[in-house]
Amino acid sequence: MESLPIVLLSLISKAVVLICSLLTLIIQNSTAVTWGLACVWLAYVSFRFLFQVKITVHPAARETFESMVRKFQAESMFSEEATPCIVSVGDKDADLTPDPQREDIKIVKSSRRVSYAVRVAHVAKAQVGLLANSRANELVYSRLCREEMVKHGVRPSHIAHMVPLAVAACFIPLDSDFLAASIRQGEGMRERRALLGPSWEKXGGLLVTSGFTTPTWRGDPRGMLVTKGPPLAKPRKLYRFTGMGTHIRYGVHDHSLGNVRRGLVERLYMVEVKGELQPTPKPTPGAFNQMSRFSDRLSIHLPKTTRLTPREFLGFYTGRKLERYQKAVESLEMHPVREKDAWLSTFVKAEKLNITAKPDPAPRVIQPRDPRYNVEVGRFLRHSEEMLFKAINKTFGGRTIFKGLSSDQAGEEFKTLWDSFKDPVGIGMDASRFDQHISKDALEFEHKMWLSMFPKSERAELARLLSWQINNRGLARCPDGEIRYRVEGCRMSGDMNTSSGNCYIMCATVHNWCDNIKHIKHFRLANNGDDCMLVVERSDEKKVRNGLIEYYATLGFTMKVEPTVDVLERLEFCQTRPVLVDGKYRMVRNLHQSMSKDLHSLHDLDSSAARNAWVTAVGTGGRCMNDGVPVLKEFFKQFPDYNLEVKKGSDMAQKLRDDWKYKFNRTAAFQDLIPTQESRYSFWLAFGLLPDEQIALENGFSPLKMEIVNEQIQEETSLLQFSGA
């Protein structure tokens, strides 16, 4: 307080000099413009003067700061009289005391506010350490301090006053911070580090690995005939960029007899229960009859339609699919569709497998039917799909089906959905191997809905076509053998109605469950097939969870219910989470998916032209997808851009277009947006990566090297392994 006159005198003298300068200018140039500018400038200077005086000379600022430092020193590891950082209640020297009106609420003693702020700051810094003084880190500390005070039961009005003080205390360096900085910058440290020799730049390259066949051979389901052949001669290839610091490894399954057999056994016929295989569970007889209320409500919004002509159906497709279906249409003009066209042609899906998480997963098989069958079913269902999705949205009272939305649209829809609740929580629902658990009863329930959309004159033909999806016959030809099989029910991955049918069944089951719980008036669902996020009020969470797994068991499904989340950014949906980017929410892919999976390719990259085309396409798409997103934008800027124009219609162009299948595509042009402080905070909420860690990762990226190497490069330890991202 003694310095107040000096500060005021200094500021007043500056203001007098500025005012005199302005008056001189006005006298010399007495024009309207000059007078106007002078008045504006004078008002601005006056405002800044008053504001600066108010902030600089706040009577409690210096005293409070010094008190905080003393408290930190009293509880320092270097103090022999250190006091434990524990918040007690009711004691003479306690920071908190019970509220006279409510015992479950605590108030902060006026004489102990600084002490309490420092203790809370200790807890926050114990979690994340000393962070740089930035707006993003201020938000991090603010959230941690607020959560700690809520845990203590502090009165909300006191929390509002205490959080700013606690946040300010978080940014005060401790004695140990000064000591550590002195050690790092000391001459002794430099001398010892010099003994290590020069630090070489990490080098990496493109490593080629072969596909594999699972060693697991178990289960003996009825309806499957296996014929062995010669050994597999040509395995698949997986290309991976090494030396990038990513710790997740991927592999690829070969299209082999062993992989097809295990895929059919464990993804079609049987499920694993306590380490043993058992037949896939069936629903309780009549279980799907309880969905009639949802079907009745949906029918109000579901319009009637008619079958498309072959030409109209072909209008939905381009490229290779158009060529394939065009040939099928020409064939159907010669010979009508028959049941044999619905038989399955089975092969192992070529996909990147996270073998770090699961070294020996069951292979995923693709089971398409003949294009002739798809054309005939598609003439009924291809255009009806969008009508169904709109009807489901109306039945739920808002956007429910998220298929076809861009990442920006999906993020804003999640924000709107979340804001429609007073105190929302999200419950993730994961139906284990959903396609496998789609029973005959579930298919018949779905087919009944499709039939209701068409006139009686067309229902018989549609019913005949759909009935061939219930009793299935399949053939898998592999280089080392073949498998013939029969199965009742199950969803086949190549069917025209796989996506829409799964959406309908999942939405019906969720709506039926929530609608039958008493006193739940508001619930919303985000659905993309078997991937669901149910949002309800916090007060309804226990009622929704109670009995949910058992309910799905009666329907023949094995449902896994994820832990409840109460922060928008922590909603997990299709391996993406909402992140605030450039003022709006956008669905951002999981860090590990982006920074590990995208460094692998199933395309043949032996030639330099193929490598350059692939890396350019992935980098261009990744930068566009993550423009303005912390870490990920800089990660994809590592990918070289060779400014190549891949010839349209070529195999490489088609493969690149098919391979870049982010579930939430983004078409905006790359603008190289700089992540805002709010984005860094939102990114931390979503993936657990602190703003300082984000910046450290970004500073460590360097351009990819495209040379093929014959041995694996040692990976560097990544912050992602410890950040909880």
From Swiss-Prot:
Gene3D superfamilies per the UniProt record, alphabetical: 3.30.70.270
Methyltransferase in keyword set: no
Enzyme nomenclature, EC number: 2.7.7.48
GO biological process assignments: viral RNA genome replication
Annotated ranges, domain RdRp catalytic: 424-544
A single GO molecular function term of this UniProt record: RNA binding
Pfam families reported in the protein's UniProt record: RdRP_3, Tombus_P33
Record keywords: Nucleotide-binding, Nucleotidyltransferase, RNA suppression of termination, RNA-directed RNA polymerase, Transferase, Viral RNA replication
Database matches in InterPro entries: DNA/RNA_pol_sf (IPR043502), Rev_trsase/Diguanyl_cyclase (IPR043128), RNA-dir_pol_PSvirus (IPR007094), RNA_pol_HCV (IPR002166), Tombusvirus_p33 (IPR013707)
Signal peptide: none
Known catalytic reactions: RNA(n) + a ribonucleoside 5'-triphosphate = RNA(n+1) + diphosphate
Keyword GTP-binding tagged: no
Enzyme class, broadest EC rank: transferase
Any further remark recorded for this protein: Readthrough of the terminator UAG occurs at position 203.
Family, per entry: Belongs to the tombusviridae RNA polymerase family.
Function: RNA-dependent RNA polymerase that plays an essential role in the virus replication.
Protein name listed in UniProt: RNA-directed RNA polymerase
The species this protein was found in: Tobacco necrosis virus (strain D)
